[in-house]
């Protein structure tokens, strides 16, 4: 079995843990902080910040993450700050980001937003920055202030549609690529005849993989497109897109909670299993499917809780 080991920083390790939650394996080897299994690859992340990829797709999966490959003494293909044009942070850019991919409940939500140099001082004054450390109330407060100022497009993939696409063989990467491409296209149409100097996508797949996912799309945005991990820190457009996406995600979550009559939790941990089991007991499995990503391990865990 082919093994690939990469060394990552702590924020990347946490991001990987969240990304692989839908494929999580509860049995952790000694020293591990997460373990997951996807088609053709098993992934194990360790406290040492080393992540091991085992299987025929191990190397391909590893290359999605910006990190050193110690075993081969080479570097994974890196799409990061280094390849962006000079003074990128001050350019007029469309940025895009997504939320909801690691949450059992709720839709995948993608936002593309345009920020030009003239707008930047005001956005900074309003609190636009990397939103990962922000709580929902702050996210919502800032989003409501910037949405009238920032040309943007938000697209949601509701859970019933997500489940339908997933059963037809589409993975999350494909869904995200479609949503990013369409959201960016929507913003370009709003801006016309003005053109951005660049487009920056918060990277979730290699460039070639991203465009392969879009192969059947009638319109594919390729001109001046860049991909980078941690893109919120590289341009305010991505930070703004992330804030707006999270705001819309929170709104969708609140609406679903009211509809089902139960406060729905974010994430995909044990606390989520308990709420899912309650929904199954009260309303049935079909109702749960309306609000969740069915292929997550939480579905089976909740069913086992109900059967006890």
From Swiss-Prot:
UniProt cross-references to InterPro entries, sorted A to Z: RNase_HII/HIII, RNase_HII/HIII_dom, RNase_HIII, RNase_HIII_N, RNaseH-like_sf, RNaseH_sf, TBP_dom_sf
Family annotation (Pfam families): DUF3378, RNase_HII
Residue stretches making up the RNase H type-2 domain: 91-308
Reaction catalysed by this enzyme: Endonucleolytic cleavage to 5'-phosphomonoester
Cofactor info, note text: Manganese or magnesium. Binds 1 divalent metal ion per monomer in the absence of substrate. May bind a second metal ion after substrate binding.
GO MF annotation list: magnesium ion binding; RNA binding; RNA-DNA hybrid ribonuclease activity
Compartments where found: Cytoplasm
Keyword Kinase in record: no
Cofactors demanded by this protein: Mn(2+); Mg(2+)
GO CC field: cytoplasm; ribonuclease H2 complex
Documented EC number(s): 3.1.26.4
Described purpose of this protein according to its UniProt entry: Endonuclease that specifically degrades the RNA of RNA-DNA hybrids.
Protein name per UniProt: Ribonuclease HIII
Gene: rnhC
């Amino acid at each position: 079995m082919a093994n690939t080991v990469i060394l990552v920083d702590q924020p990347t390790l946490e991001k990987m843990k969240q990304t692989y939650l839908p494929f999580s394996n509860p049995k952790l080897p000694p020293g591990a902080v997460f373990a997951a299994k996807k088609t053709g690859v098993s992934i194990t992340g360790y406290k040492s910040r080393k992540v091991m990829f085992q299987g025929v797709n191990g190397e391909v999966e590893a290359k999605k993450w910006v990190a050193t490959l110690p075993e081969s003494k080479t570097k994974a293909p890196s799409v990061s700050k280094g390849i962006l044009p000079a003074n990128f942070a001050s350019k007029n850019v469309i940025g895009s980001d997504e939320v909801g991919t690691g949450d059992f409940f709720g839709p995948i939500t993608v936002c593309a937003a345009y920020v030009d140099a003239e707008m930047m001082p005001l956005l900074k004054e309003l609190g636009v920055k990397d939103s990962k450390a922000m709580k929902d109330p702050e996210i919502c407060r800032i989003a409501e202030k910037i949405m009238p100022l920032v040309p943007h497009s938000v697209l949601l993939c509701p859970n019933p549609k997500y489940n339908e696409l997933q059963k037809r063989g589409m993975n999350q990467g494909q869904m995200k690529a479609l949503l990013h491409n369409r959201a960016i296209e929507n913003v370009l149409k709003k801006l016309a005849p003005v053109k951005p100097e660049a487009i920056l996508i918060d990277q979730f797949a290699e460039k070639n993989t991203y465009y392969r996912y879009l192969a059947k799309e009638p319109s594919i945005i390729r001109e001046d497109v860049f991909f980078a991990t941690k893109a919120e820190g590289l341009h305010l457009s991505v930070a703004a897109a992330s804030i707006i996406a999270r705001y819309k995600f929170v709104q969708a979550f609140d609406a679903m909670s009211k509809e089902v009559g139960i406060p729905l939790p974010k994430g995909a941990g044990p606390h989520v299993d308990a709420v899912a089991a309650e929904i199954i007991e009260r309303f049935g499995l079909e109702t749960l499917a309306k609000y969740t990503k069915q292929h997550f391990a939480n579905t089976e865990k909740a069913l086992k809780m109900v059967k006890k």
